[in-house]
């Protein structure tokens, strides 16, 4: 059957409506049955309409590119490339909009949710579920609905005086708070970018000498440290131990963290934080980090709070380099540079997670990058800053410095993705070259080689290396996705780069799953994974699903599938089990499981197994790292080894799943495989036994007290 402009659904030429009928029709003869006319389904009509819209958008975009449409300003260099005027355009260039029970959700076209929306075969599943969910909640407002996300956005439930806040801290013994502060500085890799450890400890001693002398905002900063440290302890609990003592411990730690977050909001309000001032940005940034750790999925509230933080930073002049301001100390200037670099990273990461344009543009700021210095190299008494240490020396701040440098290029790429104007393949080549240069500039002490070469590294360093690598792969996908199915002269390279990058990201996901198992190298650091991290893997999964479904739509017989297609199928099958294990606690994981059910043809009728048929299961090796990607020569310099990713606020750059239905399809969901759970069940060791909690009763009492106050 041939469809197209001027054709009927059966492929015949359409007669003009003005054609006169030569004689009246006085009778009709019964026609015989059409010879095996194919049935035109609703799905066929959807595809036909999509193809027409796609053709029209291509024509419109090319016209704009030729007549003043222009391409986005690219301030990342002037390398000479042969001019290629092919314009990046796909059927989802305008992004994706979905109505929800509470309004509408929009994401840019490079967001994983928009990618899945572009798969016609998923439309019926996703849309029908949307309608079912929304019809249940339409016009119904729960009187007992809890506020989720940062309470600071909605006002504190009960304002508190400084004396009340002080009393809640002083009710704890100092050793209790000391342990929490120690846990924070020894666990959180973002701490040197926000707080100067030497100066903070001086202020900490002054607080215990005279508690009433500190400001409410400094108290808020202390509570953010205590909150994050408590979350870190909770995340370290063994999920395989479900004894009453373990469950009680988890509940107590969650109550403590919630109590501390309530106090943070009270301190910020009491300190009139919107006016700015000392400790405001540091407290807000750590508060945002605590909220990110509390959420299993992307939350719009956190992004909005980040926007407020950016506005306060602009109001305080952080976007301008301190050299413009006379009288500012060397110490203050260096710390402002550290805070601003970290805020840029948070803005980009959370904006990309939500699938929305970032708030800080590079052309709006001239703040220089911070120096590679230990905290012991300078303090408030420093008059002239020492020279930056060489980047062969791995200081606590070096990772943030290197990542901020890489994020400059990644930020421009995200601006491309969020720009409403089309861009040319020449711009893609230029940006891709800049990205490769930025990757090559990563110091060797933070450069990923292979997991085997990381056996002497700390888990934190391993994850830092992998994060920098995955940042590049994410950016490659975002940059080349629009040309993936574009003009033949450009699509081959872009398709290869996108597929190899997506496969590599899923290899990292698989390694993450393996190395975070008991007795493996990253087991004690598995808590570092956040909702931001999973968006890298969501994008990789959705882009591979999109590719496979488009291959099917092109009519390629199964017997003609390429080795790359087989590699993709194996990788997606392994990821399916990982997503399935997370689906109980994550709506985003449930959504991608539904998509994979359709793409992989997974039976969803059984509630006793993972849903993979025997042929699929047999093709996935159990308990070993995926090596299929290494069988291919990569155009993006894929390293030989694999690794896993557990960044803290390191998901910078990948889109969100927020536009899908909360629950996809009414069919019962398959349960995860028993292998991982059985291994945990066989282990009877209570890992909490080695954790002495002499301070638990005091912290629990504080949590109960604060919760009672909030209900008064």
UniProtKB/Swiss-Prot annotation:
Protein's cellular compartments: Nucleus
Alphabetic keyword roster: Activator, DNA-binding, Metal-binding, Nucleus, Transcription, Transcription regulation, Zinc
Encoding gene, per UniProt annotation: TF23
GO BP annotation list: DNA-templated transcription
Key word Metal-binding present: yes
Entry's induction text: Expression is induced by the final product trichosetin and not by the trichosetin cluster-specific transcription acticator TF22.
Annotated region described as Fungal transcription factor, given as residue ranges: 302-379
Matching Pfam families: Fungal_trans (PF04082)
Main location per the UniProt record: nucleus
PANTHER family: UNCHARACTERIZED TRANSCRIPTIONAL REGULATORY PROTEIN, ZN(II)2CYS6 TRANSCRIPTION FACTOR (EUROFUNG)
InterPro entries with a match to the protein in the record: Sec_Metabolite_Reg, Transcription_factor_dom_fun
Function per UniProt: Transcription factor that regulates the expression of the gene cluster that mediates the biosynthesis of trichosetin, a trans-fused decalin-containing tetramic acid with antimicrobial activity. Plays a specific role in the induction of the cluster-specific MFS transporter MFS-T and thus regulates the detoxification of the toxic trichosetin in Gibberella fujikuroi cells.
Phenotype when the gene is knocked out: Resulted in the down-regulation of the three biosynthetic genes from the trisetin cluster and a reduced accumulation of trichosetin, and blocks the expression of the cluster-specific MFS transporter MFS-T.
A GO MF label: DNA binding
Signal peptide stretch: none
Location of the region described as Disordered in the Swiss-Prot/TrEMBL record: 1-26
Domain of life, per lineage: Eukaryota
GO cellular component entries: nucleus
Protein name: Trichosetin biosynthesis cluster transcription factor TF23
């Amino acid at each position: 059957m041939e469809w197209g402009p001027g054709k009927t659904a059966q492929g015949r030429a359409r007669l003009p409506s003005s054609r006169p009928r030569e004689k009246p029709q006085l009778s009709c003869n019964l026609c015989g049955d059409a010879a095996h006319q194919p049935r035109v389904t609703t799905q066929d009509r959807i595809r036909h309409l999509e193809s027409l819209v796609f053709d029209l958008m291509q024509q419109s975009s090319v016209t704009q590119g030729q007549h003043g449409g222009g391409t986005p300003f690219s301030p990342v260099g002037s390398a000479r490339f042969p001019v290629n005027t092919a314009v990046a355009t796909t059927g989802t260039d305008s992004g994706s909009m979905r109505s929800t029970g509470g309004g509408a959700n929009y994401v840019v076209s490079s967001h994983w949710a928009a990618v899945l929306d572009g798969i016609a075969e998923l439309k019926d599943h996703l849309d029908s579920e949307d309608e079912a969910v929304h019809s249940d909640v339409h016009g119904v407002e729960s009187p007992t609905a809890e506020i989720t996300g940062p309470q600071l956005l909605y006002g504190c439930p009960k304002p508190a005086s400084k004396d009340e806040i002080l009393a809640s801290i002083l009710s704890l013994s100092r050793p209790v708070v000391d342990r929490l502060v120690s846990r924070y500085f020894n666990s959180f890799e973002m701490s040197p970018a926000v707080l100067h450890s030497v100066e903070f400890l001086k202020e900490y001693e002054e607080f215990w000498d005279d508690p009433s002398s500190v400001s409410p905002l400094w108290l808020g900063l202390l509570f953010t440290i205590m909150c994050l440290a408590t979350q870190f302890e909770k995340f370290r609990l063994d999920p395989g131990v479900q004894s009453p003592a373990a469950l009680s411990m988890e509940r107590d730690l969650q109550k403590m963290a919630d109590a501390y977050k309530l106090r943070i909001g009270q301190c910020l309000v009491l300190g009139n934080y919107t006016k700015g001032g000392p400790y405001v940005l540091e407290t807000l940034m750590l508060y945002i980090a605590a909220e990110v750790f509390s959420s299993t999925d992307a939350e719009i509230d956190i992004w909005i709070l980040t926007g407020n933080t950016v506005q306060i930073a602009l109001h305080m002049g952080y976007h301008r380099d301190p050299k413009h301001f006379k009288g500012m100390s060397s110490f203050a200037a260096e710390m402002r540079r550290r805070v601003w670099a970290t805020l840029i990273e948070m803005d980009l990461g959370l904006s990309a997670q939500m699938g929305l344009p970032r708030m800080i543009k590079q052309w709006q700021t001239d703040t220089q990058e911070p120096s590679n210095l230990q905290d012991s190299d300078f303090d408030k008494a420093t008059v002239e800053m020492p020279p930056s240490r060489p980047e062969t020396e791995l200081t606590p701040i070096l990772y943030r410095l290197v990542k901020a440098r890489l994020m400059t290029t990644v930020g421009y790429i995200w601006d491309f993705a969020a720009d409403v104007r089309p861009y040319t393949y020449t711009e893609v080549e230029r940006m891709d070259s800049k990205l490769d240069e930025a990757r090559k500039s990563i110091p060797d002490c933070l450069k990923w080689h292979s997991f085997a070469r990381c056996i002497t590294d700390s888990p934190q360093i391993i994850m830092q290396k992998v994060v920098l690598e995955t940042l590049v792969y994410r950016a490659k996908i975002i940059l080349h996705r629009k040309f993936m199915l574009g003009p033949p002269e450009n699509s081959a390279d872009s398709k290869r780069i996108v597929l190899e990058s997506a496969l590599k990201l899923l290899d990292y996901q698989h390694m993450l799953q393996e190395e975070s198992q008991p007795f493996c190298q990253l087991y004690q650091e598995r808590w570092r994974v956040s909702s931001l991290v999973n968006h890298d893997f969501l994008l990789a999964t959705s882009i591979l699903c999109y590719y496979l479904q488009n291959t099917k739509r092109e009519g390629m017989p199964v017997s003609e599938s390429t080795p790359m297609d087989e590699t993709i199928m194996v990788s997606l099958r392994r990821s399916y089990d990982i997503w399935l294990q997370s689906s109980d606690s994550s709506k985003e994981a449930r959504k991608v499981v539904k998509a994979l059910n359709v793409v992989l043809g997974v039976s969803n009728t059984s509630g006793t197994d993972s849903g993979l048929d025997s042929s699929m299961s047999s093709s996935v090796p159990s308990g070993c790292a995926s090596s299929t990607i290494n069988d291919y020569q990569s155009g993006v310099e894929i390293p030989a080894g694999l690794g896993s990713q557990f960044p803290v606020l390191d998901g910078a750059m990948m889109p969100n799943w927020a536009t899908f239905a909360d629950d996809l399809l009414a069919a019962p969901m398959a349960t995860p495989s028993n292998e991982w759970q059985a291994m945990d069940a066989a282990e009877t060791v209570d890992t909490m036994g080695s954790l002495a909690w002499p301070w638990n009763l005091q912290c629990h009492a504080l949590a109960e007290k604060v919760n009672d106050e909030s209900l008064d």
